[in-house]
Amino acid sequence: MRDLFAALVALALLATAASLATTLQAYRRRRGRLRDSERALGRTIVAEIPAGDDLVLFSADASRFYYGERSIDKDLITAVRVLINGAPIAAAVSPRYPEEPDRRPTSFEDRPEGIARDRWDVAIETVTGTVLVECGAIRERVSQELARTVYEVVKDAVGGN
């Protein structure tokens, strides 16, 4: 009886492992198709940003940046800022758009996540509004590197100082 129970438990564990492996393969194929479709459109993938249960691509072509389904015209970008917990720590302003005297640095309301972790974001200010690229609060170095990569690419594109 004990051997039968052990065999059933082993079979259940094998079925669970096979299910997890199949799900992981499907997820990898879906991500691969997404990357391939971005490249087929002539876009360069800058970063894969974790969002919820999936990854959002931040990509670029000659005239635009793409954050998920949103497109951001490079010519309309006025400034880019790195935010940590909603407060700006680095900024670059486009020389195409002179800074207005009443313009204040971008900041967003801090959302406490329950655990003391820093949340890294990049705010891309355009003529039409601000796009917040949420790089996350996974682990400090991971989110920080994602934010730094996005910031540097956008800063280089707008010719900020």
Where are these regions (language model features)?
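Acidic, Ser/Thr- and proline-rich intrinsically disordered linker/docking segments
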Residues: V80-N161
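Acidic-enriched, low-complexity/disordered segments with a strong bias for Aspartate over Glutamate
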Residues: D3, D36, D53-D54, D61, ...
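Glycine-centered tight beta-turn/hairpin loop motif at sheet-sheet or coil-to-beta transitions
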Residues: D53, E69, V127-T130
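Generic detection of short hydrophobic beta-strand segments and adjacent strand-loop junctions
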Residues: A47-I49, I72, V131-C135
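Anionic N-terminal interaction surfaces
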Residues: R2-R64
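Extracytoplasmic/periplasmic/luminal assembly and interaction segments
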Residues: L57-G86
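Sequence-level detector for tyrosine residue identity
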Residues: Y27, Y66-Y67, Y97, Y151
